[in-house]
Amino acid sequence: MTNIRKSHPLIKIINHSFIDLPAPSNISAWWNFGSLLGVCLMLQIITGLFLAMHYTADTTTAFSSVTHICRDVNYGWLIRYLHANGASMFFILLYLHIGRGIYYGSFTFMETWNIGVLLLFAVMATAFMGYVLPWGQMSFWGATVITNLLSAIPYIGPNLVEWIWGGFSVDKATLTRFFAFHFILPFIITAMVMIHLLFLHETGSNNPSGLNSDSDKIPFHPYYTIKDILGFLFMLLTLMTLVLFTPDLLGDPDNYTPANPLNTPPHIKPEWYFLFAYAILRSIPNKLGGVLALVLSILILMLFPMLHLSKQRSMSFRPLSQCLLWALVGNLIILTWIGGQPVEHPFITIGQLASAIYFFIILILMPTTSLMENKLLKW
């Protein structure tokens, strides 16, 4: 009799995805981030569900309901901070996952990569709308500033903004719809993750060498299940340290002041994980130009398969490209720092330079370096 694991229509799918899945024998810890992101998504959905049970999406009571969760609900403070810092964890893992994809040439799996970029957009939208829900000062003004960017779209812009607001300013209607979207999007993300995995399992995983690994595969369970569990423990340790010792480390103190449409905070800035994009947005004096640069800074990821001119898939054996990638990482760190600074003399210039360098490295330097390395192979 065949094992139920292999014969049952539903369990069979799980078996082919997580148990008997043939995986390359040499994938490193950089391949742990996919499963960590899955765990993070589940954690966010569970904590979010419990928060939604006590939260009220109304401008008069939203801020108080969050306070009530933290003070009066059993372990409400823990659930709230797990959810808030879980988002930061999510983005750390997401950026590492994307970095891994760029370094090892995983973007050559076009379908998987493009679904991944769409996933990034969906997660960013979800995080932005979630930040609006506590209805603090930064929530309100962040929502006002970011939604206002859509007014830069020619002809339909102003109408579009009012349509999204549900009125002539960010108000009750905006908060209610943002809560609805923030609730539904993670489930859409979960469905997209399944498609992401479906496409990945069509081709099989990439590996650090960038070479075909069909001749040397091992079963996912127990080898990589145990390796993933180690990753979960590290992630949990980091997250719990953050939540239990410094829960407000990554937050903005302004968000502990209830939203006041009559008082603008001195520095409006998003959460840390959006600062690099915010810096790119601010570095262009023109509104529409800034919005385009902002969208392109993420959308540029879709161009990676086209910009890949090297004869080798992975960067493992390409030291010059490695240097460029690490320069890009450094540049992104500088952009993140600039995004959190006021719009004043040295920061404006640094931001503009870093933004230009960001696009220059990806669009010009990386492809030309790849061609040069191809030449060096013959030399």
Swiss-Prot record:
Topology term for the membrane: Multi-pass membrane protein
Pfam annotation, one family: Cytochrome_B
Primary localization: mitochondrion
Entry binding sites for a ubiquinone: H201
Transmembrane segments: 33-53, 77-98, 113-133, 178-198, 226-246, 288-308, 320-340, 347-367
Bound cofactor: record note: Binds 2 heme b groups non-covalently.
Residues annotated to bind heme b b566: H97, H196
A biological process term (GO) from this entry: mitochondrial electron transport, ubiquinol to cytochrome c
Chain sites annotated for binding heme b b562: H83, H182
Annotated disulfide bonds: none
Alphabetical UniProt keywords: Electron transport, Heme, Iron, Membrane, Metal-binding, Mitochondrion, Mitochondrion inner membrane, Respiratory chain, Transmembrane, Transmembrane helix, Transport, Ubiquinone
A molecular function GO annotation: ubiquinol-cytochrome-c reductase activity
Subcellular location as annotated: Mitochondrion inner membrane
Needed cofactors: heme b
Gene3D superfamilies: Cytochrome Bc1 Complex, Chain C
Gene Ontology cellular component terms for the protein in this record: mitochondrial inner membrane; respiratory chain complex III
Functional note: Component of the ubiquinol-cytochrome c reductase complex (complex III or cytochrome b-c1 complex) that is part of the mitochondrial respiratory chain. The b-c1 complex mediates electron transfer from ubiquinol to cytochrome c. Contributes to the generation of a proton gradient across the mitochondrial membrane that is then used for ATP synthesis.
Quaternary structure and partners: The cytochrome bc1 complex contains 11 subunits: 3 respiratory subunits (MT-CYB, CYC1 and UQCRFS1), 2 core proteins (UQCRC1 and UQCRC2) and 6 low-molecular weight proteins (UQCRH/QCR6, UQCRB/QCR7, UQCRQ/QCR8, UQCR10/QCR9, UQCR11/QCR10 and a cleavage product of UQCRFS1). This cytochrome bc1 complex then forms a dimer.
PANTHER family given in the database record: CYTOCHROME B
Family (UniProt): Belongs to the cytochrome b family.
Note: Heme 1 (or BL or b562) is low-potential and absorbs at about 562 nm, and heme 2 (or BH or b566) is high-potential and absorbs at about 566 nm.
Full protein name: Cytochrome b
Native organism: Octodon degus
